[in-house]
UniProtKB/Swiss-Prot annotation:
Gene3D superfamilies linked to this entry: Transcription elongation factor, GreA/GreB, C-terminal domain, Transcription elongation factor, GreA/GreB, N-terminal domain
Keyword Ligase belongs to the record: no
UniProt keyword terms in alphabetical order: Coiled coil, DNA-binding, Transcription, Transcription regulation
Role description: Necessary for efficient RNA polymerase transcription elongation past template-encoded arresting sites. The arresting sites in DNA have the property of trapping a certain fraction of elongating RNA polymerases that pass through, resulting in locked ternary complexes. Cleavage of the nascent transcript by cleavage factors such as GreA or GreB allows the resumption of elongation from the new 3'terminus. GreA releases sequences of 2 to 3 nucleotides.
InterPro entries: GreA/GreB_C_sf, TF_GreA/GreB_CS, Tscrpt_elong_fac_GreA, Tscrpt_elong_fac_GreA/B, Tscrpt_elong_fac_GreA/B_C, Tscrpt_elong_fac_GreA/B_fam, Tscrpt_elong_fac_GreA/B_N, Tscrpt_elong_fac_GreA/B_N_sf
The protein's name in its UniProt record: Transcription elongation factor GreA
Coiled-coil annotated spans: 43-76
BP terms from Gene Ontology: DNA-templated transcription elongation; regulation of DNA-templated transcription elongation
Gene: greA
Family per similarity comment: Belongs to the GreA/GreB family.
Domain of life: Bacteria
Species per Swiss-Prot/TrEMBL record: Chlorobaculum parvum (strain DSM 263 / NCIMB 8327)
SUPFAM superfamilies per the UniProt record, alphabetical: FKBP-like (SSF54534), GreA transcript cleavage protein, N-terminal domain (SSF46557)
Length: 159
Protein backbone atom coordinates (compact mmCIF):
# COMPACT_ATOMS: atom_id res chain seq x y z
CA UNK A 1 0.00 0.00 0.00
CA UNK A 2 1.33 3.44 -0.87
CA UNK A 3 1.24 6.67 1.14
CA UNK A 4 -2.12 8.17 1.95
CA UNK A 5 -3.35 10.58 -0.72
CA UNK A 6 -5.91 13.31 -0.24
CA UNK A 7 -8.57 13.90 -2.86
CA UNK A 8 -11.72 15.89 -3.37
CA UNK A 9 -14.88 13.90 -3.99
CA UNK A 10 -14.65 14.92 -7.69
CA UNK A 11 -11.02 13.82 -7.90
CA UNK A 12 -11.83 10.46 -6.34
CA UNK A 13 -14.74 9.95 -8.74
CA UNK A 14 -12.55 10.85 -11.75
CA UNK A 15 -9.95 8.25 -10.75
CA UNK A 16 -12.70 5.69 -10.19
CA UNK A 17 -14.17 6.39 -13.65
CA UNK A 18 -10.73 6.13 -15.24
CA UNK A 19 -10.15 2.79 -13.50
CA UNK A 20 -13.52 1.49 -14.70
CA UNK A 21 -12.78 2.54 -18.29
CA UNK A 22 -9.30 0.98 -18.28
CA UNK A 23 -10.37 -2.26 -16.62
CA UNK A 24 -13.34 -2.81 -18.92
CA UNK A 25 -13.19 -1.17 -22.35
CA UNK A 26 -9.44 -0.58 -22.71
CA UNK A 27 -8.52 -4.01 -21.32
CA UNK A 28 -10.93 -5.64 -23.80
CA UNK A 29 -9.40 -3.68 -26.72
CA UNK A 30 -5.88 -4.75 -25.74
CA UNK A 31 -6.92 -8.39 -25.44
CA UNK A 32 -8.44 -8.16 -28.92
CA UNK A 33 -5.14 -6.79 -30.27
CA UNK A 34 -3.28 -9.71 -28.67
CA UNK A 35 -5.71 -12.22 -30.17
CA UNK A 36 -5.39 -10.59 -33.61
CA UNK A 37 -1.59 -10.62 -33.43
CA UNK A 38 -1.60 -14.23 -32.20
CA UNK A 39 -3.66 -15.24 -35.24
CA UNK A 40 -0.78 -14.17 -37.51
CA UNK A 41 1.24 -17.23 -36.57
CA UNK A 42 4.77 -17.56 -35.19
CA UNK A 43 4.92 -15.51 -31.98
CA UNK A 44 8.72 -15.56 -31.77
CA UNK A 45 9.05 -13.08 -34.63
CA UNK A 46 5.75 -11.25 -34.30
CA UNK A 47 6.39 -7.56 -33.54
CA UNK A 48 2.65 -6.84 -33.47
CA UNK A 49 2.21 -9.46 -30.74
CA UNK A 50 5.15 -8.11 -28.74
CA UNK A 51 3.76 -4.57 -28.98
CA UNK A 52 0.31 -5.70 -27.86
CA UNK A 53 1.79 -7.61 -24.90
CA UNK A 54 3.82 -4.53 -23.92
CA UNK A 55 0.66 -2.41 -24.12
CA UNK A 56 -1.09 -4.97 -21.90
CA UNK A 57 1.73 -4.82 -19.38
CA UNK A 58 1.58 -1.02 -19.23
CA UNK A 59 -2.21 -1.09 -18.93
CA UNK A 60 -2.14 -3.58 -16.05
CA UNK A 61 0.48 -1.45 -14.27
CA UNK A 62 -1.73 1.64 -14.67
CA UNK A 63 -4.78 -0.26 -13.41
CA UNK A 64 -2.79 -1.46 -10.39
CA UNK A 65 -1.57 2.07 -9.70
CA UNK A 66 -5.12 3.46 -9.81
CA UNK A 67 -6.39 0.67 -7.54
CA UNK A 68 -3.65 1.50 -5.01
CA UNK A 69 -4.41 5.22 -5.16
CA UNK A 70 -8.11 4.65 -4.61
CA UNK A 71 -7.43 2.21 -1.76
CA UNK A 72 -5.17 4.72 0.00
CA UNK A 73 -7.30 7.80 -0.70
CA UNK A 74 -8.85 10.00 1.93
CA UNK A 75 -11.66 12.17 0.62
CA UNK A 76 -11.46 15.67 2.05
CA UNK A 77 -14.51 17.75 2.82
CA UNK A 78 -13.85 21.37 1.81
CA UNK A 79 -16.13 22.53 4.68
CA UNK A 80 -13.64 21.13 7.19
CA UNK A 81 -10.56 22.84 5.75
CA UNK A 82 -9.15 25.62 7.92
CA UNK A 83 -8.01 28.87 6.35
CA UNK A 84 -5.62 30.11 9.04
CA UNK A 85 -2.74 28.64 7.05
CA UNK A 86 -2.17 27.20 3.59
CA UNK A 87 -3.24 23.54 3.53
CA UNK A 88 -4.23 21.09 0.84
CA UNK A 89 -7.53 22.24 -0.78
CA UNK A 90 -7.04 25.86 0.23
CA UNK A 91 -6.92 28.54 -2.42
CA UNK A 92 -4.28 31.23 -2.12
CA UNK A 93 -4.21 34.73 -3.57
CA UNK A 94 -0.64 35.93 -4.10
CA UNK A 95 0.97 39.23 -5.07
CA UNK A 96 4.11 38.98 -7.17
CA UNK A 97 6.63 41.13 -5.27
CA UNK A 98 8.68 41.60 -8.44
CA UNK A 99 5.64 42.93 -10.33
CA UNK A 100 3.19 44.51 -7.86
CA UNK A 101 0.40 44.54 -10.47
CA UNK A 102 0.44 40.76 -10.84
CA UNK A 103 -2.01 38.96 -8.57
CA UNK A 104 -2.34 35.21 -9.03
CA UNK A 105 -4.47 32.55 -7.43
CA UNK A 106 -3.77 28.87 -6.92
CA UNK A 107 -5.63 26.01 -5.29
CA UNK A 108 -3.39 23.42 -3.65
CA UNK A 109 -4.37 19.85 -4.44
CA UNK A 110 -2.82 16.39 -4.53
CA UNK A 111 -0.57 15.45 -7.43
CA UNK A 112 -3.42 13.34 -8.82
CA UNK A 113 -5.68 16.40 -9.18
CA UNK A 114 -3.12 18.99 -10.27
CA UNK A 115 -4.04 20.92 -13.42
CA UNK A 116 -2.11 24.14 -14.02
CA UNK A 117 -4.62 25.27 -16.66
CA UNK A 118 -7.25 25.38 -13.90
CA UNK A 119 -4.92 26.95 -11.33
CA UNK A 120 -4.71 23.68 -9.37
CA UNK A 121 -1.15 23.02 -8.27
CA UNK A 122 0.26 20.03 -6.46
CA UNK A 123 1.26 20.38 -2.84
CA UNK A 124 4.44 18.57 -3.96
CA UNK A 125 5.33 21.16 -6.61
CA UNK A 126 7.97 23.79 -5.79
CA UNK A 127 5.23 26.42 -5.39
CA UNK A 128 3.05 24.10 -3.30
CA UNK A 129 5.91 23.10 -1.01
CA UNK A 130 6.83 26.75 -0.47
CA UNK A 131 3.25 27.75 0.40
CA UNK A 132 2.18 24.89 2.70
CA UNK A 133 1.90 26.07 6.31
CA UNK A 134 2.23 29.76 5.51
CA UNK A 135 -0.24 32.47 6.64
CA UNK A 136 -1.72 35.66 5.21
CA UNK A 137 0.99 38.34 5.09
CA UNK A 138 3.85 35.86 4.82
CA UNK A 139 6.37 36.42 2.05
CA UNK A 140 7.69 33.38 0.21
CA UNK A 141 10.60 32.81 -2.12
CA UNK A 142 10.12 29.95 -4.53
CA UNK A 143 13.03 28.40 -6.40
CA UNK A 144 12.06 27.39 -9.93
CA UNK A 145 14.21 26.39 -12.92
CA UNK A 146 14.13 29.97 -14.25
CA UNK A 147 15.30 31.48 -10.96
CA UNK A 148 13.39 32.71 -7.92
CA UNK A 149 9.85 33.97 -7.54
CA UNK A 150 8.86 36.28 -4.68
CA UNK A 151 5.26 36.42 -3.47
CA UNK A 152 3.23 37.76 -0.59
CA UNK A 153 0.18 35.81 0.56
CA UNK A 154 -2.84 38.12 0.39
CA UNK A 155 -5.65 35.69 1.18
CA UNK A 156 -6.33 32.05 2.02
CA UNK A 157 -9.79 30.65 1.36
CA UNK A 158 -11.73 27.56 0.29
CA UNK A 159 -13.68 27.58 -2.95
Amino acid sequence: MSDRIYLTRDGYNRLKEELHLLSTQTRKEVLEKIAEARSHGDLSENAEYDAAREEQSQLEAKIGDLENKLASATILDPKQIKTDRVYILTSVKLRNLDDEDEIIEYTLVSSEEADSDLGKISVRSPVGRALIGKSVGDKVTISVPKGELHYEILDIFVK
